[in-house]
Structure formats: C-alpha cells, structure tokens
UniProtKB/Swiss-Prot annotation:
Pathway: Porphyrin-containing compound metabolism; heme O biosynthesis; heme O from protoheme: step 1/1. GO terms for molecular function: protoheme IX farnesyltransferase activity. This is Protoheme IX farnesyltransferase. GO terms for biological process: heme O biosynthetic process. Its EC number is 2.5.1.141. GO terms for cellular component: plasma membrane. It is a multi-pass membrane protein. Converts heme B (protoheme IX) to heme O by substitution of the vinyl group on carbon 2 of heme B porphyrin ring with a hydroxyethyl farnesyl side group.
Length: 306
C-alpha cells in the first residue's frame, strides 16, 4: 500500500462549527440524500395516498441517523485506506478534525438512536430493518466483502436498498411483494451506478488493493456488466406495474428513464471496447437522475385519479 503524506489540522484550533461540520461529513450526507430519495415515495405508495406528514418526517429522520451511523462506522473502519486514496483524503478522520474515538462513539450513538426512534415513531419492524441495514453494511460489506471480492458492491449494495423496506414497513407494519420488487430495483441499479465511479478512481482503488471490478477486469468488462444490470433494472421496474397497480405516470417514467439509463450504459461499453476516451461519470450521474425520476413517479402515481 502506498503511503500518502497528510496535512493534519491542529485539534486545539478546531471550533464548534468546524467540529459539527466534521461530524456531518462523517455521515456522508450526499449518500444519505440518495437513500432518502426512495423512502418518502415508497411511503406514499404503501399508504395509497399521503401518509401522516409527521410519520414521513420521523422516518426520514430515523433513516438519516441509520445511514449516517453505517457511513460513520465505514469511515472508521476504512480510515487506513482513506489516508492513501486521493478522493477520500478530506474526510475528517484523515484530516484529524475528529479522533478515532470520537468517530466510533458518534457512530454508536446515532445508530442506537435511529433504532429506538424508528421503533417509537413507527413500529419495531421498521426499527429491526434499520438495525439489519447497519449490521449488513458494516459487517458484510465493509469488513468482509469490500477488500476481498470484485462483487463487493453487488452484495454489499443490499444495505442501500433497505430504506424502501423501512419506509413500507413504517406505514403498513409488514412487507409484501411490492416493497420486495422496489428493493430489487435498487439492488440491481446499484452496480451500474457505482461501477462507473470506480472506473474513474481505478488507480485509487488499486493503490489500496481494493479489488473493484475496474481494477481486476478492466473497463470493457465493467461496461458489459453495467449493460446487463441496467437491463435487469429496467425489467424489474416494469414488474412493479402489475404487482402494485402502477398507472400511466410510473409506466412512462420506467420506460423512458430506464431506456435512457440502458442507452448510457451501452454508450459507455461501446467506447470502452473501441479504446476511445470514456466519461464514466456520465453514466454515474445518469443513474442518479434515473433513480430519482423513477421514485418520483412512484410517489406521484398513487396521488393521481388515473
């Protein structure tokens, strides 16, 4: 492993505002935003209309704490490789804005708080799913899969699918086929979302011996896999139509958004096999827009009379 030289801050000069900002950064808020995009629409679908606004707000708060805890544990565990990878050298455990102990205590506090909070404001099934998401992300993905297999993001990505189950369970108190399909949509979407990012930062991952698919197989193999998973995502999204009785808005969003996503993955692969310059982040950003559009339609469709 290469050793990067770090510029660590003097902890005695860190004020309250900067310390607070460091704690927020530890939770990876941009990742949390993407996770929460799926939660509220699923709650609307589960209710068949608007749930209690306070329930939506409460579940979003609980989901933020849960995901933040998992991400904070991840930062603590991966602090050794974060000090080497260029894209992670501004994280608070690398810069010294937070100590290892502060990060670990914080992760435990907000994790426990998320479980209790969700149990109290919704139900204990939602709380149990929150606990399962944290444990899976920390132990299965971060500690077991991430540094061992190129399929790390495939199976580890299951933790990022849990918000749809949590949102559904918070409203209905159970799990049916509709949330399972929604779970699978996010599960199948995750690899073609994340693998292009790993293509851009291939050298970063290689420098710390993390066997991302782009590191061990190359960009053509990544391009082909993104195609396969994007088609699977599109097909799975269409299954929701008969299962949940989705209407015209969702159907159009699934077809148009899914078709666009598939096109972008094909374009990435075509450029890769021709050894032409590629822009993997184009697929990365397209995947975010696609998922946001799809789940926006999930939330809008039950509110319409047609």
């Amino acid at each position: 492993m290469n050793v990067a030289v770090q510029s660590r801050v003097d902890r005695e000069t860190i004020g309250v505002a900067r310390k607070t900002k460091a704690y927020v950064a530890l939770t990876k808020p941009r990742v949390i935003e993407l996770l929460l995009v799926t939660t509220a629409p699923v709650m609307i679908l589960a209710q068949g209309g608007w749930p209690n606004p306070w329930l939506i707000l409460g579940v979003l708060v609980g989901g933020t704490l849960s995901a933040g805890s998992a991400n904070a544990f991840n930062c603590y565990i991966d602090r050794d490789i974060d000090r080497v990878m260029k894209r992670t050298q501004r994280r608070p455990l690398v810069t010294g804005e937070l100590t290892d102990r502060e990060a670990l205590v914080f992760a435990w506090i907000i994790g426990v708080a998320s479980i209790i909070w969700l149990g109290v404001i919704s139900n204990w099934l939602a709380a149990a799913l929150s606990l399962a998401a944290i444990l899976f992300y920390v132990f299965v993905y971060t500690l077991w899969l991430k540094r061992r297999t190129p399929q790390n993001i495939v199976w580890g990505g299951a933790a990022g699918c849990m918000p749809v189950l949590i949102g559904w369970a918070a409203v209905t108190g159970d799990i049916s086929w509709a949330p399972v399909i929604l779970f699978m949509i996010v599960f199948l979407w995750t690899p073609p979302h994340y693998w292009p990012l790993s293509m851009k930062y291939r050298d970063d991952y290689a420098s710390v011996n993390v066997p991302m698919l782009a590191v061990v197989r190359g960009r053509a193999a990544v391009g082909l896999q993104t195609i396969l998973y994007s088609w699977a995502t599109l097909a799975c999204s269409l299954l929701l139509i008969p299962v949940a009785g989705m209407g015209l808005v969702y159907t159009l969003a699934a077809l148009a958004g899914g078709g666009w996503f598939v096109y972008e993955t094909h374009r990435l692969y075509d450029l890769a096999v021709r050894h032409e310059p590629i822009k993997p982040m184009r697929v990365f950003h397209a995947s975010i827009s696609y998922l946001s559009l799809l789940f926006l339609a999930v939330g809008i469709d039950p509110l319409l009379p047609f």
